[in-house]
Amino acid sequence: MIENPVQLILPKRFGDSRGWFTEVHSVPAFAALGIDCTFVQDNHSYSAPAFTLRGLHFQTPERGQDKLVRCIRGRIYDVAVDVRRGSPTYGQWVGAELSAENGHQLFIPIGFAHGFLTLEPDCEVTYKCSDTYAPQNDGGIRWDSVGIGWPMPVGTTPELSEKDKVQPTLAEFDSPFAYGGRPLAPLS
């Protein structure tokens, strides 16, 4: 079992002259990685401009969401930030490029804020969630308060929603999430 709570998933692609086939989610394969959750909602987002930033979002523990994120068109930089109170890696983050071409996915468990930056125009992202959307449990932290090395040209201001512009900073955030004994580690 892999100990890192956030995991980069590299599904195998089986190709021939017609194209390729891949399994994006398999309960036994995920269980072998230590991922034990049931996904109940699939989300699909489209971002027209390059350097659109969505995040950093979560749902509070009562309706927390494990997420499995993949990019099905274009390229994104996907990030998870540890927001578990008492964690030795609180406030630390990991990120990975996900693209339609590489097929990589990022598993982000409850207790981590999630966000992504589009690296080119016309990106589509799908993600599976372990609970349905609950507006009363919706939360977030500011995208620029954690020290994330967002890969965008110097002087670029990302395209943000009005909601994401006014999220609290990490320093202002009073986390409702508790640490469960698995510190964040670099992705492998």
Tell where the protein language model's regions lie, with residue ranges.
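Beta-rich strand-turn-strand
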Residues: 98-107, 112-117
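Non-catalytic, conserved peripheral segments adjacent to functional cores
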Residues: 1-102, 120-122, 129-188
